[in-house]
């Protein structure tokens, strides 16, 4: 399903459309006829959609509708059953060669996924490393950044997420919300072109959720990173998204501007889902 044309809508003063994505003609993310099966169970059923450069798109829908699977396919944490995924017009895991669908070699896939960062439900910080070491580990060992530069960058990111004073502490000394903010800084340290957010507040105590969402709002407002977001925080989705896609049964049943989806949904499944959670 292509990106929705929002026509002559007039976004409000705090609308994400104030920082609308650029459009150079090549989608940052493209799913073409994507199918994902686990055994006999089809999780994604012939999925087609694009995400433009700098666009922030939130995926909503009931559990089991395929939202997290989309993120995991982009990170190559799951194998694609059928179809193609493209990043900046380049194949992520498979390409057509002489009319045949051929899997790319692991080295090529690894190079492609360096463009993508992901923040998971569970923060999974290394317990034996300090906060700043958790953030510098990948830039030093994957990108080849020197340790001093990596530390300077990490401290800047910790400042951005409000945790600079925790730099030399271990994760066990931090609350769940603080650990998730470190995980966000860790993902940003790799300078991703695309940031995937998978229910990043679902494992947190309710009083810690706002701090994490405020950090993500700041990231959305201050960067041009393309973001694909899975969340049940509907106000957050409304605040930061350029588009919202509603999933059910591994298919997109509605795709539109946040105000359209949340105030005047057209699909009955969308209406039922939103009535249940709002």
List where the protein language model places each region:
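ABC-family P-loop ATPase nucleotide-binding domain
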Residues: 1-35
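C-terminal boundary and immediately downstream tail of ABC-type ATPase nucleotide-binding domains
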Residues: 2, 247, 259-278
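ABC family nucleotide-binding domain
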Residues: 24-260, 266
């Amino acid at each position: 399903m292509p990106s929705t044309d929002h026509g002559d809508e007039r976004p409000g003063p705090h609308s994400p459309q104030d920082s609308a994505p650029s459009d150079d003609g090549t989608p940052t993310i493209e799913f073409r006829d994507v199918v994902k099966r686990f055994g006999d169970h089809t999780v994604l059923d012939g999925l087609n959609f694009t995400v433009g450069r700098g666009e922030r798109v939130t995926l909503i829908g009931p559990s089991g509708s395929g939202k997290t699977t989309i993120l995991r396919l982009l990170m190559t944490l799951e194998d694609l059953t059928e179809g193609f995924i493209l990043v900046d017009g380049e194949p992520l895991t498979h390409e057509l060669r002489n009319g045949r669908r051929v899997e790319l070699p692991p080295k090529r896939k690894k190079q492609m996924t360096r463009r993508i960062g992901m923040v998971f439900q569970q923060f999974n910080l290394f317990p034996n490393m300090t906060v700043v070491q958790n953030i510098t580990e990948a830039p030093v060992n994957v990108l080849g950044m020197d340790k001093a530069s990596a530390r300077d960058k990490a401290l800047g990111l910790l400042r951005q997420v409000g945790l600079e004073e925790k730099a030399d502490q271990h994760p066990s000394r931090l609350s769940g919300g603080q650990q998730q903010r470190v995980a966000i800084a860790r993902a940003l340290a790799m300078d991703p072109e695309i940031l995937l957010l998978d229910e990043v507040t679902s494992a947190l105590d309710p009083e810690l959720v706002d701090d994490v969402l405020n950090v993500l709002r700041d990231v959305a407002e201050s960067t041009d990173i393309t973001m694909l977001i899975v969340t049940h925080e509907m106000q957050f989705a409304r605040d930061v998204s350029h588009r919202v896609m509603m999933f059910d049964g591994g298919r997109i049943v509605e795709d539109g501007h946040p105000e359209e989806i949340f105030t005047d949904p057209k699909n009955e499944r969308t209406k039922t889902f939103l009535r249940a959670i709002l």
